[in-house]
């Protein structure tokens, strides 16, 4: 019985190994949301989900920006959200006039989206994703299109395990194979003026990672045709030490910058009035607008929530500028589900603008959170203005699960830490400040991606004030980006990829310490931070790497 049990376990492990998807790129940043399943053909022309050529219900619609004129039809991607991960096959695209096209967008069917998010109506703005092999069963298949003729042969090719590089056809009377043309879908066409296709014809489909399969066509019958096999997914030398899955990608640093940035809302706030998210009547130096509202009594609070949640391990805290119409002694900042451990400033909020830093070590939190709260605990109505709300990037953010410093030379992977920059969208480097100077100076740095970069959003960090309140203890602290990993990948499909996967920076999990009391009253002043020329060069190289990585997908 013990031998039988061991045999069953071994067979199970083998089956699991063969059924799991193989990572083909590093982790990157995108956006994911739910959509309805197609009941008829999408732009890839696979037909109904439950039809003979259908791809099933775990599928994705891409935005036009990422669809690449049909090149990604049939490719599989692992998409990660706050709940978990799913693997989907690309079957459709959404035009630029209908869907956002600044960065990769995955519109997932209900069966797929419920695997990454508990809220079917949410948008996961910081989804992680990577290209993987598909869990295809059986050989690659094809079907002749009904509008084909002996002068015009159109084939739908499906059930491929990895991406298709090319398709050729050689008729009975041809001296050499002819490349079929992709029709912005999973369909490929042969047509030559005045020439007929003579049967039998040989069709060869080549993989993006090397290797090919063949099939012989004897007629234009619309029966399902089977190739000689399926592509073999690369099992090694693609992504070394790949993590089990991608985590949520790093949120952009800016939460409020002259308005709430994309993905943030205040809808969970309570007991407030007169809210204005773009109040131009009062703002700190360097800004043009602030978020203003009246907090009404001791149970009132401003809660800022991010759709699709955010991962705290990329950051060490938040910072913001704030003032009130009267002295306010009862401000508390905390994560909504962890109210018993909070941060409060060492001195009351006054009628003058001041900058505050809240280290996450002062708060009890999980790896993934959805919001944070600014609460009023006094039995008064107080009008507050708040602006320049930013995450503070970890000073030592390094991606995990990829090559470390000792492996880089041999693996073709590079893991980079930017000591003086923070992590913006998709790992693009930007600067972060933990405080402001005591004068009315402004320090800011912005890194924005190019049109071919992974992310379109701009992560910016600024700090300005005429007075300084509670900031992180220990003086000026520089913040680091999550880094970009690039990979030299064998084959023509994916040569490089940028990583925005989970970081090893603290804090991780829940912190311990004082509860139910004012925490971290330490203060320090910091002067404006200046990038060295080497840091600027590193940031520039990161931007170039990110652009090349995404363009190669």
From Swiss-Prot:
Disulfide bonds join 44-73, 76-134. Disruption phenotype: No phenotypic change. The keyword Secreted applies. Residues 497-516 have a biased composition (Polar residues). It is found in: Secreted. Residues 41-139 form the Expansin-like EG45 domain. Residues 520-531 have a biased composition (Basic and acidic residues). It comes from Dictyostelium discoideum. Residues 421-447, 460-531 are annotated as: Disordered. GO terms for cellular component: extracellular region. This is Expansin-like protein 7. Belongs to the expansin family. Expansin A subfamily. Glycans are attached at residues 39, 276, 325, 406. PANTHER family: EXPANSIN-LIKE PROTEIN 7 (PTHR31836:SF21), PTHR31836. May serve to lubricate the movement of the cellulose microfibrils during cell growth and wall extension and/or may serve to maintain the fluid state of the slug cell wall. Overexpression shows aberrant stalk formation. Keywords: Disulfide bond, Glycoprotein, Secreted, Signal. GO terms for biological process: culmination involved in sorocarp development. Its main location: secreted.
């Amino acid at each position: 019985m013990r031998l039988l049990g061991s045999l069953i376990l071994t067979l199970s492990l083998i089956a699991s190994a063969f059924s799991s998807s193989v990572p083909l790129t590093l982790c990157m940043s995108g956006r994911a949301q739910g959509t309805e399943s197609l009941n008829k053909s999408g732009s890839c022309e696979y037909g109904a989900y439950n039809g003979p050529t259908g791809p099933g219900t775990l599928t994705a619609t891409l935005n036009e920006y990422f669809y690449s004129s049909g090149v990604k039809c049939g490719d599989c991607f692992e998409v990660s959200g706050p709940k978990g991960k799913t693997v989907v096959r690309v079957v459709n695209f959404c035009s630029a006039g209908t869907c956002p096209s600044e960065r990769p967008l995955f519109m997932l069917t209900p069966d797929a989206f419920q695997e990454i998010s508990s809220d079917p109506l949410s948008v996961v703005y910081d989804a992680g994703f990577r290209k993987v092999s598909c869990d295809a069963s059986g050989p690659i298949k094809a079907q002749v299109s009904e509008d084909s003729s002996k002068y015009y042969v159109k084939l739908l090719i499906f059930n491929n395990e990895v991406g298709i590089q090319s398709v050729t056809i050689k008729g009975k009377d041809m001296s050499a194979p002819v490349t079929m043309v992709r029709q912005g879908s999973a369909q490929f066409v042969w047509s030559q003026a005045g020439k007929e296709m003579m049967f039998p014809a040989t069709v060869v489909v080549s993989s993006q990672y090397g290797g090919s399969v063949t099939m012989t066509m004897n007629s234009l019958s619309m029966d399902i045709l089977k190739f000689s096999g399926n592509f073999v997914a690369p099992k090694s030398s693609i992504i070394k030490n790949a993590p089990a899955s991608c985590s949520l990608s790093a949120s952009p640093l800016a939460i409020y910058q002259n308005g709430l940035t994309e993905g943030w809302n205040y809808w969970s706030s309570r007991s407030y009035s007169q809210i204005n998210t773009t109040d131009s009547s009062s703002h700190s130096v360097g800004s043009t607008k602030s978020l203003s509202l009246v907090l009404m009594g001791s149970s009132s609070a401003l809660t800022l929530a991010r759709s699709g949640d955010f991962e705290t391990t990329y950051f060490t805290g938040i910072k913001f500028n704030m003032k009130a119409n009267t002295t306010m002694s009862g401000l508390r900042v905390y994560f909504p589900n962890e109210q018993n451990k909070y941060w409060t400033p060492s001195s009351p909020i006054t009628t003058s603008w001041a900058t505050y830093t809240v280290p996450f070590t002062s708060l009890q939190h999980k790896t993934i959170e959805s919001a944070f709260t600014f609460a009023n605990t006094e039995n008064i109505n107080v009008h507050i203005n708040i602006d320049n709300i930013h995450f503070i990037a970890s000073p030592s953010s390094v991606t995990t699960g990829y090559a470390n410093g000792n492996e880089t030379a041999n693996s073709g992977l590079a893991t980079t830490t930017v000591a003086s920059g923070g992590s913006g969208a998709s790992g693009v480097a930007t600067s972060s400040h933990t405080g402001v100077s005591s004068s009315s100076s402004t320090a800011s740095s912005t890194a924005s991606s190019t049109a071919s970069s992974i992310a379109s959003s701009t992560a910016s960090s600024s700090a300005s004030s005429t007075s300084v309140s509670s900031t992180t203890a220990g003086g000026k602290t520089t913040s680091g980006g999550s880094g970009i990993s690039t990979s030299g990948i064998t084959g023509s499909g994916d040569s490089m990829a940028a990583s925005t996967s989970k970081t090893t920076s603290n804090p991780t999990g829940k912190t311990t310490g004082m509860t139910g009391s004012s925490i971290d009253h330490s203060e320090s002043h910091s002067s404006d931070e200046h990038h060295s020329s080497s840091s600027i060069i590193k940031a520039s190289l990161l931007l170039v790497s990110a652009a090349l990585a995404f363009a190669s997908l």
